[in-house]
């Protein structure tokens, strides 16, 4: 299904969203935390650049509204809902792997640290990889 293509993922929120574009192997091509008001513009911009055919959307509380807006804007784009369970915890760990703590913070267990910036973009990456794993196993 995803052979050779790209996919986008969104962790929708009321004020901000995580957004990421990955290739079929799960390599991150783009990631960003964006204001929800700019979501449609950002998706459109990256759609033109990366030509993804699937957009993975976290199934949280604002997913229905986000799905409707995206499908209205890009009717040919397949929007797939993915379970968000525990993705925030996973995203915090991924954040610290990508940006290891410095100074005295490196002495603390990562589970005790709070990232200094939103991790919604890392959540989007996790959602995309969950989708890819499901596609590889035939669950999607």
Predicted regions and their residues:
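Phosphate- and other anionic-substrate recognition elements at nucleic-acid/protein interfaces
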Residues: 2-10, 14-140
């Amino acid at each position: 299904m995803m052979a050779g293509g790209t996919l986008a993922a969104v962790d929708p929120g009321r004020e901000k969203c995580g957004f990421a574009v990955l290739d079929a192997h799960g390599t991150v091509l783009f990631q960003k935390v964006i204001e929800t008001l700019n979501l449609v513009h950002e998706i459109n911009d990256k759609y033109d650049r990366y030509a993804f055919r699937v957009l993975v959307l976290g199934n949280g509380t604002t997913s229905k509204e986000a799905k409707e807006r995206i499908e209205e804007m890009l009717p040919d784009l397949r929007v797939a809902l993915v379970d968000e369970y525990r993705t925030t915890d996973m995203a915090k760990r991924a954040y610290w792997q990508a940006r290891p703590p410095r100074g005295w913070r490196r002495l603390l267990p990562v589970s005790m640290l709070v990232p200094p910036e939103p991790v919604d973009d890392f959540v989007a990456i996790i959602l995309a990889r969950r989708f890819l794993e499901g596609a590889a196993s035939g669950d999607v």
